Amino acid sequence: MEQKMIAAAHFKNWLLEKKMIPVYLEVVNQFVRNELNYYVIEYMVAGSELLIGVAGGYEEGAIEHCGHVHSKMELLMEGNEIEQAEALVDEIEGFWSSHAAVVEQIFRENAEEGRFVGHLLLASHEWDADSLCLELAERWNIQVESELSGTALNFNVDDMQVEISLYEGQMEHHAAQIHAASNIDWPEVLDVVNYHQAYLKVMVRSGASRLEAGKLHVKVMSCLSMQDNVLAVDAAGTIFEPGLYDEYSDLMKDGSFPLYNMIHFGFYRTSKGLSGYTYGLKMFGELEIEVLDTLGETEDLHEFLSTLVYSVLSGQIELKNGNKISLAEGHELMVSEGMSEALNEITVKVEYPD
């Protein structure tokens, strides 16, 4: 099926979700923006004149879009349809950019205060506190000495405080949808996220050790992730399938750090090569790590970033501007600091051993 036919189908589904039934719909033009294909749609609903919409962006040959499907039910201006469609894309990008900035600010504030925060997206406004307490005792030998207060549960573990709260409706600022965009390995992630009707917020306030607080947070989240009405797990700036999040947490059973529960690794390609970055290190008082313009493959860069994170959190290396580090004998790598290429913050950039 041609990509433009897929775009037309996506736009039709978008209309139907908004309870609008098109009586006419056609792709009339297309344009490229940021190396993505966009399709201009003209359509009519009952009683309307010709209206304009847009569907995109699609990578070349792809069948999934990046979420830019939109219309304001404005009249199509013949000869000016591309400018109208680009204005719709501008509006979408501005909307998501403003919400993403709020979500990121909340994350930074939590990091500065030593608060680990994650969410469980729920199919219904309910959860089982008794089941959580049993799971914590059986799996992690954590005894919860507290009672449920309404829909909230608070308890202490050593010098750390755990707070669990149930909220009706979807997460504020479209945070779940924003985080869903970073999970390219789960094709249905956005559909799942859009379905959630309630959510649990899990917060752990750090004591003397942020590492221990992070581990405790993962233990609580992993136990909750397997409750029947959990659709997805929102943590480390991305969305996890519940079973995968729980599987990653099992690393702690042999004393390992639950790296993939707590740190998200992002990758992107440009004409200069493959780049990657971390998201979540700031929770431990560290700058995020970035590696730019490599000639390697994603799997190799992922392994390299993982090694760096383990080494930083275990205290084996210190990433400071101007330092040289050695991960392998006889091979020194330069470290620098500067504004991120992918994140709106200062990161440490580490030379890649191409």
Predicted regions and their residues:
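Short Lys/Arg-enriched alpha/beta "domain-start" segment
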Residues: M1-N29, R115-E135
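Mixed-charge, low-complexity intrinsically disordered regions
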Residues: A8-H99
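Aromatic/basic-lined ligand-recognition segments
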Residues: M20-V28, R33-I41, L51, A236-D354
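Intrinsically disordered, low-complexity regulatory segments enriched in Ser/Thr/Pro
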Residues: A46-E83, Y167-M203, G273-D293
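Structural alpha-beta junctions
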Residues: G61-A62, E138-S146, V220-D234, L313-L319
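Internal, hydrophobic cores of structured domains that mediate oligomerization or house catalytic pockets
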Residues: L88-E113, M160-M262
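Conserved aromatic-histidine-acidic binding/catalytic patches
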Residues: L120-S124, R205-E212, D293-E297
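N-terminal low-complexity, intrinsically disordered segments
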Residues: L122-L190
